[in-house]
Amino acid sequence: NDYSKDCYQILYDRYRNDEIYKICRYALQRVAKSYYIPDSTNTFIFLWTTLEAIASPEYENVKKWKGKVISFIVQDQTNYNKLGEYIKKISKDVRTELVHNGKLIQDLDDYSTMLAIDKELTKIKNIIIDYVIAVYITGIKSFTELDNHRKELQNKLGVN
């Protein structure tokens, strides 16, 4: 996916300054900054907290926020469930190990190579970017409007 044109437009939009625009721009800036973090464990945590931040202005656990993100970036219930399972698995198997058990990502069984780690980090970056673009193009300017639109999307997907 070539995100460059959409990302550029979001980063440098001179006509919007609302709370949704700011969180979208903030998320893209964090994705860009993540490339400069030399440690993969810290990169993962940085990106994961970005996912949490774009889902809601208040802290929510993964069970609550994952549906908020997923509903904007999938087209059907099958993909909704698939992405939801992926996020739940990564939260349990990776985030918990890094954040609560103090492990390094490269010490986890599935991430013993840089290729495996980079693949996972890229997946997370793409989820963030897909969400940001989907939200930005709605033109929605407040979290209240965003929640209402999200509920409509979830109804269409049959996942509420």
Task: Go through the PLM ranges and name each one.
Residues 1-160:
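Amphipathic, oligomerization/interface secondary-structure segments
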